[in-house]
UniProtKB/Swiss-Prot annotation:
Species of provenance: Thermoplasma acidophilum (strain ATCC 25905 / DSM 1728 / JCM 9062 / NBRC 15155 / AMRC-C165)
UniProt cross-references to SUPFAM superfamilies, sorted A to Z: ComB-like
Protein's UniProt name: Probable 2-phosphosulfolactate phosphatase
PANTHER family: 2-PHOSPHOSULFOLACTATE PHOSPHATASE-RELATED
HAMAP family: ComB
Gene3D superfamilies, sorted: ComB-like (3.90.1560.10)
Taxonomic classification: Archaea, Methanobacteriati, Thermoplasmatota, Thermoplasmata, Thermoplasmatales
């Protein structure tokens, strides 16, 4: 069974929990791994991420807080920016307003991250699972319609329904135009890019890595 919850309010979990934050965390996270990062360490607190880099100088800092790149960070929470970065073999410390908050709330089950950039790979991974919870990250002040829209798309596709993905990306683009200080054009283009990668990130033992299941999909 595939259910849709609320990343900020749900208090029960599934065997597989799918975090969705279209603008921009769950688009950026697959791109970090796609660009060669060894693994990602998620932080809710910017200061703790900076302190980690101070103790581990080779760390790359990526993220934002309330839409703004923090001081001392190497990259914004920007899939377009990350797409041009060489992260080969690097450890990335990552923080964001919504995605890492939702991650911190989940208490059981596997945790994976999905967006348009790894849509088909996510569908392939969850469609045969018996207990899946899709968690739109939403926002501190309320719902995020782009996350809810994608969650419904992911559910329909995983259940075997035929859908017009372009209609969902079109609606998502419209949503962005109505958001105050919405995503910039370069990031928007990346956030709407379908199946850019087969990588499905998974949170395992405190690190975000390429899911072993998505490795199998890539090799197939």
């Amino acid at each position: 069974m595939i259910r849709i919850g609320d990343g900020r309010k749900s208090d029960s979990w599934a065997e597989i929990n799918v975090v969705v934050d279209i603008f921009r965390s769950t688009t950026t996270i697959p791109m970090i791994l796609f660009r060669g990062a060894k693994y990602i360490l998620p932080f809710r607190d910017v200061r703790k991420a900076i302190e980690f880099k101070r103790r581990n100088p080779g760390t790359i800092l990526v993220g934002e807080k309330y839409g703004i790149k923090p001081p001392y960070f190497d990259y914004d929470n920007s899939p377009a920016e990350i797409a041009e970065a060489d992260l080969s073999g690097k450890v990335v410390a990552f923080t964001s307003t919504n995605g890492t908050y939702v991650l911190s709330r989940i208490r059981s089950g596997r945790i994976i991250f999905s967006s348009y950039v790894n849509l088909s790979a996510t569908v392939a991974m969850i469609r045969s699972q018996r207990d899946v919870l899709i968690l739109p990250s939403n926002r501190p002040i309320g719902k995020a319609p782009e996350d809810i829209l994608f969650a419904n798309l992911l559910k329909l596709m995983a259940e075997g329904h035929e859908v017009d993905v372009s209609e969902y990306t079109r609606k998502t683009e419209e949503i962005n135009r109505n958001i105050i200080a919405g995503v910039g054009e370069r990031d928007l283009e990346f956030c709407l890019r379908v199946d850019h990668t087969n990588i499905v990130p998974e949170y395992i033992d405190g690190r975000i890595v390429q899911s072993p299941d998505s490795v199998a999909l890539t090799d197939a």
